[in-house]
Amino acid sequence: MMKQEFKEDFFEVLRMIVESDSMALSRYADGEANVLKNNTIGNKDGWLYKQDKNLVFRADLRKALLCTDPNYFYGISCTCCDKPNHDYLLSIIRTGRENLTFSNIFVNANFPLFQEHFLKTLAASKKDIVVCTGKKAKMRDLNERVPVKDFIPIPGNCVVWWEKNREYIRGLLDLKASQYTNAVFLFAAGPLSEILIHEMWQVNPKNIYVDIGSTLDPFLFRRNSRVYHRGDSEFAKRYCSW
């Protein structure tokens, strides 16, 4: 159960990764909110949503925000960083408050905690680890810190890839979700992560599905891709409030 307390919720997620056999954490922030609003938006990682063009992607992203299963959690924008999108996302979500936390749960002032505890928690869980992220990820670097059982690569612009290959990808997700039980799936695929988590949850909720965003970029892509990766930044010291 989430309490909308920045540090406390972080450790609750870690506890569930170890102790639960069924949990999803899907995170919606400004990028996802702008897609839902049908605004053209993209980012440095190479994904781009075009207004009125990628409406299939938008529809699937919206549906992925409506789950009310008791073990399905959503992280959304906080009031201290983005109150307009906090309010907007709350107006769409149907699940209860106990299933809501911060989209920033792994970043900002919690990032040092993530660095210290997250990979250790994965190792301590002794569960199979499956990573879904960009195809150029350096899986060997991550493997040196935690054993990765499987890798689902995402090529190019995730928005276009999903729309052009939707049925094939659904088949692939069905295969992967049904191959594992009580495994931990880590997603770092932009706003597509939320769709993938929802699709796999519907196939097999007896796994752990977590959107980790850019947190492992220093390992996976050998770069500090976000400001919070640098400990001297303003964001690295921000303790988010609900």
Task: Give each language-model segment a name.
Residues 188, 192-242:
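C-terminal functional extensions of proteins
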Residues 143, 147-183:
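A mid-sequence, solvent-exposed acidic-amphipathic segment
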Residues 81, 156-158, 216:
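Residue-level detector of flexible, active-site-proximal loop/helix-junction positions
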Residues 8-12, 56-63, 164-177, 193-194:
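A short, acidic, amphipathic alpha-helical segment used as a generic capping/interface helix at domain edges
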Residues 1-145:
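Electropositive, gly/pro-rich neighborhoods at or near active sites that engage anionic ligands
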Residues 78, 152-155, 213:
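Residues at the C-termini of beta-strands that transition into short coil/loop
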Residues 128, 183-184:
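Structural motif
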Residues 122-123, 130, 169-177, 228-242:
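A polyampholytic, Gly/Pro-enriched intrinsically disordered region
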